[in-house]
Amino acid sequence: MAILVLGGAGYIGSHMVDRLIEKGEEEVVVVDSLVTGHRAAVHPAAKFYQGDLADREFMSMVFRENPDVDAVIHFAAYSLVAESMKKPLKYFDNNTAGMIKLLEVMSEFGVKYIVFSSTAATYGIPDEIPIKETTPQRPINPYGESKLMMETIMKWSDRAYGIKFVPLRYFNVAGAKPDGSIGEDHSPETHLLPIILQVAQGVREKIMIFGDDYNTPDGTNVRDYVHPFDLADAHLLALNYLRQGNPSTAFNLGSSTGFSNLQILEAARKVTGQKIPAEKAARRSGDPDTLIASSEKAREVLGWKPQFDDIEKIIASAWAWHSSYPKGYDDRD
C-alpha cells in the first residue's frame, strides 16, 4: 500500500515523511503547495507533487497516478492564530473548504482512511486542565474554528461515505530531527522556542516574555510541548488503528507536563550556553494561564509512547537544526 502525506514539505509533515521513509514499509507520496513548506525538507525517496489540495483536477491526477494509496495523513493548513483573526475567510477557504474538496476526491477514488492534524485550539479556553477529548470545544479564533469545522465535516463524511478518520489535537510542537538535517523554518516565526534560539544565534536581539502575572508558579504562561517525531509516530499509530477496522475517534497529544515560558528560556540557556537576553512585556489578549493536553487516551488505545519526553532533549534537537542551518532552508526571496 501507499500513504499520501498532505503538507509533507512543512515542519511537522516533513518529519512524518522522514519517519515513513525510515520505516520503509510502504510508498510515500507527498503533496504540498510550497506556499509555506520547503521542497528541501522533503525526503528524496518520497514521490513529490507540488499543488493545492483544493484543486480537484490536480488531486484526482495524484490519486489516479498512485492507485496503491489507501490512506491520507493531512497536515496541510494555515495555522497562524493572529493572522486568522485578521483574515478569517482565508482560513475557512484554505482549511475548511479544502477539506471538503479532499474528501470528495477521496470518496471518488475509494480511499477510506484519513488521519488529520487538528489542534487543541479547538478547545478555546478550556474548562479543565489537563484537557481531555471530552472537554467542550469552544474555539476563540478562526484558526481553531476552521479546524473544528474540518472535524465536523469528517464526522458526517464517515457516516455518509464510510471514510474513517482520526483527528489528533495538540498544542506546541518543538524540536527537530536530531541530526540537524530538517527542522522548523517559518516566515514569519511566531513560536517561542525558535525565537529564543534565534536570539541565541544572534539573529534577534532579545526575547519578549509577554506577561508575568499569570496564575502559574512563576507568573508566565505554562504550555506542554511535543516533538515532531513523537507526533509522526502518533499519526502512524492512528492510521494503523483505522486500518485494523476500529471506529473514528479523536486523540489529544501532549507531554502531559507543562513548562512555563521562563522554564523554556532557562532550559535553552543551559542547552546553548548563551545568555539569551529577555525582556518582560504586557500580556497578549486571549492567552490562557495554562494549557496542557492529556494524552492518556492515546497512550492507552494507540500505545503511544513519546520518545522525546525531556524538554532539554527537545531543545537540543532544535538547536542542532538552527546551528546547522542558521538561515533555515534559505529558499525564500
Curated annotation (Swiss-Prot):
Its EC number is 5.1.3.2. The active site is at Y143 (proton acceptor). GO terms for biological process: galactose catabolic process via UDP-galactose, Leloir pathway. Pathway: Carbohydrate metabolism; galactose metabolism. It comes from the Bacteria. InterPro entries: Epimerase_deHydtase, NAD(P)-bd_dom_sf, UDP_G4E. CDD domains: UDP_G4E_1_SDR_e. Homodimer. This is UDP-glucose 4-epimerase. It comes from Streptococcus mutans serotype c (strain ATCC 700610 / UA159). The lineage of its organism: Bacteria, Bacillati, Bacillota, Bacilli, Lactobacillales. The gene is galE.
